[in-house]
């Protein structure tokens, strides 16, 4: 939808905007936009908001360099709030935190301990560390070495998985597979591919008689 007449701005001419990392799915921040800010966002794909305290439009990262390239914009069912899905550069929060929502009021008492949930959490942590590059972080060190370094690690870990499987060493196979998955998730994050993108490919290969092979068609 590009017809802004369907948006319900409040009496001050503003609409709340929730901003989400398009890669990890993490909620980064919540702000407001006026009509001009929304129009500028749609025209430039630069996340643009309206500051209620300063009474002016502002572009995320214009001063800090922590920019947000807008991948897509969505409107909720009532037309009175927006979702910006962005590619975040650096931390989103002015405190230096990856997300403005870093202070829990209620902790998750039953986190998803299955493979899906674990991979999503690890991927989210990787994208957060890539955004902030904290000193001493393994992710930061890998990133500093360039993509070739992590690709070499993937090759090494794949070899370890093969060896552990050949030796039928279950504990070692689980450990080496975890290492392989971690470094693969890192490579995905570096090039902007999410676990959801991979899941979509796998789901597309599901046939009535089971998973289709990578080369199978139809």
Swiss-Prot record:
It is found in: Cytoplasm. It holds the Pfam family PRA-CH. Residues 119-218 are annotated as: Phosphoribosyl-ATP pyrophosphohydrolase. Residues 1-118 are annotated as: Phosphoribosyl-AMP cyclohydrolase. Its EC number is 3.5.4.19, 3.6.1.31. Its main location: cytoplasm. The keyword ATP-binding applies. GO terms for cellular component: cytoplasm. Pathway: Amino-acid biosynthesis; L-histidine biosynthesis; L-histidine from 5-phospho-alpha-D-ribose 1-diphosphate: step 2/9; Amino-acid biosynthesis; L-histidine biosynthesis; L-histidine from 5-phospho-alpha-D-ribose 1-diphosphate: step 3/9. One of its GO terms (biological process) is L-histidine biosynthetic process. NCBIfam families: histidine_hisI, PRK00051.1, PRK00400.1-3, PRK02759.1. This is Histidine biosynthesis bifunctional protein HisIE. It comes from Deinococcus radiodurans (strain ATCC 13939 / DSM 20539 / JCM 16871 / CCUG 27074 / LMG 4051 / NBRC 15346 / NCIMB 9279 / VKM B-1422 / R1). The gene is hisI.
């Amino acid at each position: 939808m590009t017809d802004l007449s369907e948006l319900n701005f409040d009496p001050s001419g503003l609409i709340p905007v929730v901003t989400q990392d398009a890669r990890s799915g993490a909620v980064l921040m919540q702000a407001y936009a006026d009509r001009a800010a929304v129009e500028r966002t749609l025209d430039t794909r630069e996340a643009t908001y309206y500051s209620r305290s300063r009474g002016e439009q502002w572009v995320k990262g214009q001063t800090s360099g922590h920019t947000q390239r807008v991948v897509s914009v969505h409107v909720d069912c009532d037309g009175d709030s927006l979702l910006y899905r962005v590619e975040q550069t650096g931390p989103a929060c002015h405190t230096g935190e990856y997300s403005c929502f870093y202070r829990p009021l209620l902790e998750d008492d039953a986190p998803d301990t299955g493979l899906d949930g674990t991979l999503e959490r690890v991927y989210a942590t990787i994208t957060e560390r890539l955004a902030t590059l904290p000193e001493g972080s393994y992710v930061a060190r890998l990133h500093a070495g360039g993509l070739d370094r992590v690709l070499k690690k993937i090759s090494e870990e794949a070899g370890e998985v093969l060896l552990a499987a050949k030796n039928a060493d279950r504990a070692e196979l689980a450990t080496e597979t975890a290492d392989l998955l971690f470094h693969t998730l890192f490579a995905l994050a570096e090039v902007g591919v999410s676990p959801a993108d991979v899941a979509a490919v796998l789901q597309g290969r599901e046939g009535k008689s089971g998973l289709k092979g990578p080369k199978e068609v139809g």
